[in-house]
């Protein structure tokens, strides 16, 4: 295997690890990065790679939040943690809208909306939305300050925002769910954590869907590229999640909004020129 392909896989994993958790759109970045860094693989495998490396990102959430995610305790005997079970029920509810639309219409959505025009528009529009929401919420105290306070109705509403991200690339799954949560009155830290947890079934399901669609017939070289990309995404995701949680305890999301606007304009200008 050429060393250059390994370096490409590492770099793509780094991009995935950063952009999957920060509300800045992994798709928007991957479209730009793909213009300059192309894996020397088949188109089918490239599509699988770009989705399956998300498994590395998922594992980072499981590692960092294991005690909050595991629904049972072994301390002093086996018993279910009701608050965690309730949280998982809400997460499943939030996943329903995207699942209903995403699975049967995955190919049609990609064909219609996976282009630079859609990505640039959603980057800019949700960037503006972030700034507007933070300006609106300035000085206000959030109504929901813990995940246990999220109701089933709130879970459905957050799920609808996740559906928007599933349909329109560039929205950013984390960006859409955080925007939805902030609009409802969820605190920044709770919105971010709920978004992290919500990613586990969503991204795991998306990875399985791609694997089943394109099959599991990989060469040893392709398996190595997948593993390296996942490992890179895993390590960088841990750092990105820790950074975001520290950052939003002292700052709002407006900086990410401005970044999205700049990136959206850059994507639009680049592809119009090229």
Curated annotation (Swiss-Prot):
Pfam families: BacA (PF02673). Its EC number is 3.6.1.27. Keywords: Antibiotic resistance, Cell membrane, Cell shape, Cell wall biogenesis/degradation, Hydrolase, Membrane, Peptidoglycan synthesis, Transmembrane, Transmembrane helix. It comes from the Bacteria. Catalyzes the dephosphorylation of undecaprenyl diphosphate (UPP). Confers resistance to bacitracin. Belongs to the UppP family. This is Undecaprenyl-diphosphatase 1.
């Amino acid at each position: 295997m050429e060393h250059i392909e390994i370096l490409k896989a590492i770099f793509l994993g780094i991009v995935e690890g950063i952009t999957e958790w920060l509300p800045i759109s992994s798709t928007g970045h991957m479209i730009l990065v793909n213009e300059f860094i192309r894996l020397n693989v088949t188109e089918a495998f490239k599509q699988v790679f770009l989705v399956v490396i998300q498994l590395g990102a998922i594992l980072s959430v499981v590692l960092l939040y294991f005690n909050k995610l595991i629904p049972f305790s072994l301390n002093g005997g086996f018993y279910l943690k009701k608050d965690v079970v309730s949280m998982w029920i809400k997460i499943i509810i939030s996943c329903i809208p995207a699942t209903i639309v995403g699975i049967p219409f995955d190919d049609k959505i990609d064909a219609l909306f996976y282009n630079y025009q859609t990505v640039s528009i959603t980057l800019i529009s949700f960037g503006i939305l972030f700034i507007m929401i933070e300006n609106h919420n300035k000085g206000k105290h959030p109504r929901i300050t813990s995940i246990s306070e999220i109701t089933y109705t709130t879970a459905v509403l957050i799920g609808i925002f996740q559906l928007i991200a599933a349909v329109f690339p560039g929205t950013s799954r984390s960006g859409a769910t955080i925007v939805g949560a902030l609009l409802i009155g969820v605190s920044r830290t709770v919105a971010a954590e709920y978004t992290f947890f919500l990613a586990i079934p969503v991204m795991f399901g998306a990875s399985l869907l791609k694997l089943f669609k394109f099959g599991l017939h990989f060469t040893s070289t392709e398996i190595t590229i997948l593993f390296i990309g996942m490992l890179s995404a895993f390590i960088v995701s841990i750092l990105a999640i820790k950074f975001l949680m520290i950052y939003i305890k002292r700052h709002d999301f407006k900086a990410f909004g401005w970044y999205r606007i700049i990136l959206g304009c850059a994507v639009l200008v680049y592809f119009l020129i090229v």
